[in-house]
Amino acid sequence: MNDQVDLLFFAAHADDIELSCGGTIAKSVRDGLRVGLVELTRGEMGTRGTPQIRYRESQRAAKILGVEFRYQLDFGDGGLRTGRDEELELIEVVRRHTPRVVFAPWPDERHPDHVRTGRICTDASFYAGLRSLQTSRPAHRPQVTAYYLQNYVLHPTFVVDVTAAWKTKMRAIAAFKSQFHDPKSKSKSKSKDPVIFISDPKFLGMIEARAKHFGALIGVEYGEAFVTKQPPKLDDIIAAYEGREP
C-alpha cells in the first residue's frame, strides 16, 4: 500500500463514493494520480446486507477502480460521532496520506451522517495543517477540500468529464450486489432484504440521468459535479471551454 496519495476521498458509507464520484476516481487513476478511499463507518445500520458483506463488496469495487487503498474507520453508523477523538483520528489520516486534494460530501446533505462527514473532514483537513497541533506525524494541509453531490443538486464549481470512465464507474457500483438492482442477474429468487430507494431498478437510471445532466453542462456525455468554497485557477481559458458553445 502506498500511503501517500494525490487525492483522498472520504465518505460516510461504502458505495457513497462510487455513486457520486466513481468516474472521477477511475479517470484520475488512469491519468496516473494516486487515489485513496476512506469510509468513516462500517455501515452497520444499513437496511440491506451486513457490515462484513459490504466491506467485501467495497474491496472488490476498490480493485475495479484501481485505487491505492480503501479502509474503514468506526465512527458509528446512524449517528456518526464527530467529537475531538474522531477529529484527531481524521487529522492523523490526512497527515499520514498527505493528499493534495480531499473530497468529502457537501456538508448540508439529506442524510445526517453525510452532513457530519462533510463537516468533520473539512475541519480535520484544516487542523491537519497546524504545526502547533502535534501528533505522531508532521503537519500537512491539502490544497483544497472539494465536495461531491449526493441527494441535492447545486450549481457546480467544476465538472469532471467522466465519459471514458463511465463503464468502470458502473462496474464498481455493480460490485455492491447487496445494495443495488442487478439487471443482468439471472437469479429467479428474490432477495430477502427489503426493497429500498437505492435497490429500486429506477435508481441507477437516476444516477445516469444526473451524470448526463452535468455532462451536458460541459458538452460531454457524462459528468460528475463538485463544489469548492473558492474558485479554481485556470491556466488555459480556451482549453477549459473547448468543444462548448455559448
Q: Where do the language-model regions lie?
A:
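Metal-dependent de-N-acetylase/amidase catalytic core
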Residues: 1-8, 84-246
